[in-house]
Amino acid sequence: MSNSIVEIEDTKCVFIFGYNASTSHPIVARRINHAKAKGAKVIVCDPRKIETARIADIYAPLANGSNVAFLNAMMNVILEEGLQDQKFIDEHTENFDAFYETVKAYTPESTQHITGIEPEMLREIARTYAKAETATILWGMGVCQFRQGVETVRALASLAMLTGNLGKPNVGVNPVRGQNNVQGACDMGALFNTLPGYQSFADPEINAKFAKAWGVPSIPSKPGVPLS
């Protein structure tokens, strides 16, 4: 995750893609509810009408297998309507021209037979996400454990970069683990090869920081031994 779970509730737009937070991660679902209560727009894209879809401002029941076409069409709208963060693109991305040539072909109209989503709804989703002061993307196993998994994750990351929703508070690309116990264990550093926050054992400054916080002289500089 590029941003912390706590930051979700202070974003202006929550874009949920292939992820049922209320079932898999109730704590994350609670943060989404808090964000909604504070006025954030909530967008849910999922073939199933999941629990969070009940509070969503927009629910898009996109067809199975249409993830990449849907996201490319979103980015097509953002570019055609000039909603991209060009400064962020110029300073922090590469190969933008080739990317633009790719998504030009994915209009809301040309992808409707793939996604099953009306063009005007797709445009509304793109505008809502792109115009938000801050926006966070959440996705889960519904995206990753799928034959388009890699391509979909790349498209979601491209969407965040296209709108400058990286590298600042309350934004980001935030893939979650399969279940809440796994998420908590990993975030808290209960892994053999990372410290809390996925920080590296190999960095002396990080090691010193945790040694001081835990009140010990030092901690090992090498990862532990995995079970497998």
Q: Where do the language-model regions lie?
A:
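Acidic, Ser/Thr-rich peripheral helices and adjacent loops at domain boundaries
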Residues: G189-Y198
